[in-house]
A protein has these predicted regions:
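Short, structured coil segments at secondary-structure junctions
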Residues: 64-66, 73-74, 175-177, 231-232, ...
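Short active-site oxyanion
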Residues: 43-47, 67-68, 154, 214-216, ...
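Asp-based, Mg2+/Mn2+-dependent phosphohydrolase catalytic module
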Residues: 231, 236-270
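Active-site phosphate-binding/coordination module
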Residues: 29-127
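Short, acidic loop-to-helix structural element flanking the phosphoryl-transfer center
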Residues: 25-44, 88-96, 137-140, 195-207, ...
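Conserved acidic, metal-coordinating active-site core of Asp-based
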Residues: 102, 106-109, 113-219, 223-231, ...
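Residue-level signal for inorganic ion chemistry
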Residues: 14, 39, 74, 155, ...
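Asp-based phosphoryl-transfer active-site loop
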Residues: 5-22
Length: 270
């Protein structure tokens, strides 16, 4: 593959840039950090795009040494380099209230993301699992019922993989055309505003920057990355990522522990 004239490099974090080290949390390799910093140094804008909260992504960005725009909450929020809000979509309060009630009645662990704060009940083992993966600050509540009536940026149910699949099949017809339901990890079912999509957020950002698809390279490993790698002129999938994503990708590279993305950047973007 010839060297790509990339003006905007967009990448997912977990499983794409970050290695999940279980008890030790997630990290990026020095080689990949160096490659991302070299991209910015040559004038390529580096945008981090994740399902995580904006504040959590900025912490990771500082560790990586990059400071471009941020797509957070799986595309529900877009902020520019100076953290100015460019777009923010929220979930209908009625839908959010129904999901909160369902989770409380069934004893399901639910994350409620609202106004930059993550609220959750301390239900094990899901509390420790989520904190171990993301290190996000959480405000614990005895019940999420008081949150009914608010418009969260997104909701995340974490439970057994089989239950995640069953819930998706149960709730998708109910909220068709009104909310997006997406499995972002085997144990995660996210309920998001219908407008929330990394691809839509990337298209919005590209328009604001007067960039065309061929100016953009995007990388990811999950179903929530399909939109953005499909929009980008060059879409990169991680080898151990979701099959549906790999089918849409132009290039497949090794996982972060094998330095696949770092090697691609070194050989094709620098």
């Amino acid at each position: 593959m010839p060297v790509i004239d990339c003006k905007l490099f967009v990448t997912d974090l977990d499983g794409t840039v970050l290695i999940d080290e279980k008890e030790a949390g997630s990290r990026a390799t020095l080689r990949l950090k160096t490659a991302l910093r070299a991209l910015e140094a040559r004038g390529t804008m580096v945008c981090l795009a994740s399902g995580r909260m904006h504040e959590s992504i900025r912490v990771i960005g500082r560790d990586l040494g990059v400071r471009g725009p941020v797509i957070s909450y799986n595309g529900a929020m877009l902020r520019d380099t100076d953290d100015a809000m460019l777009s923010h979509h929220t979930l209908d309060a009625g839908i959010a209230g129904e999901v909160v009630t369902l989770a409380e009645e069934r004893g399901l662990a639910l994350n409620f993301y609202c106004d930059g704060v993550l609220y959750a009940r301390k239900l094990q083992p899901w509390w420790d699992l989520y904190l171990g993966r993301t290190s996000s600050p959480v405000k614990p509540l005895d019940s999420l019922l008081p949150m009914i009536g608010k418009r969260p940026t997104k909701l995340l149910i974490h439970t057994l993989p089989a239950t995640v699949l069953a819930l998706r099949d149960e709730l998708t017809p109910r909220y068709k055309g009104r909310a997006t339901l997406l499995i972002t990890a085997d144990e995660y079912l996210e309920v998001m505003p219908i407008e929330a999509d990394k691809g839509h957020a990337l298209a919005d950002l590209a328009s604001r920057l007067s960039l065309k698809a061929h100016d953009i390279v995007a990388a990811g490993d999950g179903n929530n990355d399909i939109g953005m790698i499909s929009f980008a002129g060059t879409g990169i999938a991680i080898a151990n990522g979701r099959e549906a994503l790999k089918q849409k990708a132009d290039v497949v590279v090794g996982p972060p522990e094998e330095e696949g993305l770092a090697e691609f950047i070194e050989q094709n973007l620098l």
